[in-house]
Structure formats: C-alpha cells, structure tokens
Amino acid sequence: MVTFYLWRMSAAAIISNWKKKEFKPVYWLEGDEDYFIDEIVEYAEKKILSASEAEFNQTIFYGKDANWTDIVNACRRYPMFAERQVVLLKEAQQMKDVEKLESYIENPLPSTILVVSYKGKTLDGRLKFSKTIKKKGEVFLSKKMYESQLPGWVNEYLQSNGFQIKPKALHLLIEHIGNDLSRIVNEIDKLSINIGSEKNITEDHIEKFIGISKEYNILNCKML
C-alpha cells in the first residue's frame, strides 16, 4: 500500500473516530497539503456539535489575530447544555507565540476538543512543545502527494462520488492542474454539475468544462 493511502486513512480515521464520539483533547494538524487539513477542520466545525450545541460551545480563532491567553481561557471553559465544546485555531502558523499554548496542552480539559490548523509548516519534533502535543493529543501530518500517486487518488475520489473517468481524460486533468488537491476537487465538483446525469468523464468533458484547449490536448496526447 502506497504512503498516500496511509495519509488519507489517517485523516479518515480521525473523522471516523469523531463519528463514534471518540475524542482526544488536542488535535494538531500540520504539513504542506492543505486539502486534508481543511477536510478535518471542516468536519470539526460543522459536524462534531449540533447547530444548537455549537451556538454556545464552539469558538473559532485565527492565528494572525489570536491571543494565546484568550485561546487558553476558551479551552478552560466548561460546555453549556452539551457534553463537550470545540475550540478551533485556524492558520496557527501565523501566530507568533503559539508555543505558549503548551501550558494548557499539558493539562487539557477533557470536555474541550482543541483543533489546531498549522498549514505549510511542521513543528520540530525535538522540542518539548511538540512532544507534549504528541503525548496529550494527536498530531496529523499532511504531506503533498507525489505525482505517481495522483491517478489513484483522483480515481478513488471520483468513484466515491459515483463517477468513472477514461485514462486519457484522467491524464489530461492531472497534467493540466498538477498536484493541488483542493483545485482538483473543485474542478471535479464543478465538472460533475455540468455533465448532469452522465457518469463517465471523457476528454471532451475536461476540455469543455475545465477550460483546456483542444490544441493543448492534441499536443499533450502526442507526448504520451
């Protein structure tokens, strides 16, 4: 099994555990692939709590503007009319003193779920801060996918949404977009709307709805 699927399963495993109401007090999401981090954060924001629970028990901070004391104070609050609360720290890589959260992470409140998004960077595993997070919570490393792994991932994503894609169309899509997973998903989602009830994606669909010229496609095919 290639490394990519291990990464993907790690993201899926976190969400799967949440669906089973199995939570750790801290989740640290880091690395240079935004897609999987965003996937986890979106679930945490929209699915862990019901709408009525989130009204009183969900707090969102953004690293650029966040003060570590405010985050700690929010984490130390007890939930209202719910079993737990969710505290999200997005774009934590923009927070200058994020390591000061260690004082809370060393002794987290069991009823609080702190989810930290630390995009484009990774912590130095030798630091005490990093070791504390690993001891008290869970660290998810999201890496950029290798080019050789993209076809399998795109096929898996399409099949999970009820679509098939012809090999040349798949190559054309990846060649044009590259390994930006968020953009690939956005283009596929847009494509699925435009092709209506059709379930087999062809080169014509890619050319028409993703904006790839026929000249580019002809040149690309000659290079195969």
Regions found by a protein language model. Give the residues of each.
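Conserved beta/loop motifs at nucleotide-recognition and modification sites
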Residues: V2-L224
